[in-house]
Amino acid sequence: MDTVHRDKDQVVILKKANYLPYLVNLFIPKLFYPEKIVVARLYLDVNKHDKQAAENFEGTETPCFDVPPSLFADKVPMDKIVFLPTSMLPMGFEAGGVFGPGILTRRSYPIDLKAAGHKGQTPPLFVGLRMEVQPPTRVESLLKKDGESQPIQDTLMNWLHASNDLINGAQPKGQELRDEFSLSMVFNLPIPPSPPSPYSYGRIPLQCNIYTPDLSNVLLLMSHQRDLTVAILSTVNNPHVPSVAFATMGDDAECPKFELPIGVFPICEGVNRPIFLPKRFMPKGFEAGCVIKPGTLSELWFMDYIGRFGPPQPQYNGSITPPLFVGKICREEPAVDMIKKIQFEIEKKASDDAESKATLAGVKPKFDISITKGFMVMETKEPKSPKGAYSVQNYDEAFDDGCIVRVVKKPATAEEATETRERNEMCTVGDQSQELDKCSTEADQKYLSCFHVDSDIDNIAMAMARLGIADMSLHADEEELCGIDGDNALIQLRHVLEDRNQIRSHTDQLMQDHIFRMNRDRMLALRQPFTCFGCGIHEKKQ
């Protein structure tokens, strides 16, 4: 492949484009590429054409570079590539363009990126030029001379010494000179071992589009107190929690907000905007707080405002800047001596480790956890079990499986009982004793069916609807309920079964509203100028 060299002033005028996607959220691993060229396949259902952005940027200058012909196996119409504006490029690229769908022929399209058995026009293709070559740590250590870089062990020891000095009361002079905010050190309290779950949960994949950790079990240790404090988070110790992200989509009252200092923090809009957390997910002692996701702030910002005083934190991706927590301290709450609390937690953990003697006995749950098979036992007159249920012989077998909810048909009213007696009298006409025994046997025969705890809720609701008016009850003692309001739990269960479609529609509407807000913020970010880190002058995005 030919080596690519690009001048800083190498630009091209963007003409009317039929395909101009917004690729800021396109995450490409930052690996070692000798020519800094990256080729990635795009998907039309994900990377859609941004019509409004194409109209806004038409006629503006966009960065470009000479695409090497050796990148493709066959001749390619180089004049058909559409170079993207800087604000629409993926993170870490200085220039890049896209070939629209059907522009490249099958012979010229990269074989490794084309799906087997693909039919129709070729998918769009992104060709980008990275800003700088970033080799892996192992390769970089082999290329450097001995003694140039500090060993990892020394860096770890410096971190331990710095944390010990801060706990003992030593205050770096550089931190005292800053008046806008204080720099805090994150201390994660040890979490008690959770009991083993009967269900297998898949690992949450690493992503950088959104980052909302749960910081309720985190302490922030600072050498001096300011109205605002900044702490570097760890994507390893403070991972992304989807439930926190869903909680941030609620009302503004649940997520208190405040204005970040304009002179310190750059304007971040759209997908890079600060995410304000609900109070139940914030550290103790803060009235408001927000999280800035990884890769949002530049390395220059960290060098200017945090520098060498920032305590290192383990990250899954060390090639991008770490996430930050910016919190507003609550002055009304009494001060907490966090140093003593941290020392107490350390001593407690050390004593627990000594008692366990590095065995699994220390993490063994106190009670035996049995896997629950059943959830609801239903009494029907049909011998065939409802869809999604299994049959049992008696109630003892159902309760042994773990069924706690019992569903039976509601007793008949006075009118219905009168009609039943009339039908029984019809059966006794003519002294037909055999038919009488048959009628009474069919009326008294009951069949039991059980539903699993993870059965389809639609199947449960349809089976209860066939009963007519169903009566639910809990098969549990007061000691087993542990303070749970059983009547209220049954009311909520009935509400979920009856209004399940409305609940689904409401949840879907919340997600659609969130998508609308994200698209609106993204379009506003395209039109908003950004501040240059060097001179502080507002520049227009290209």
Swiss-Prot record:
User: What would changing I262N do, according to UniProt?
Assistant: In strain: ZW104, ZW141 and ZW143
> Species lineage, top-down?
Eukaryota, Metazoa, Ecdysozoa, Arthropoda, Hexapoda
Spell out the protein name for this chain: DM7 family protein CG15333
- What keywords sit in the KW lines? Repeat
Which family is this sequence assigned to? Answer: Belongs to the DM7 family.
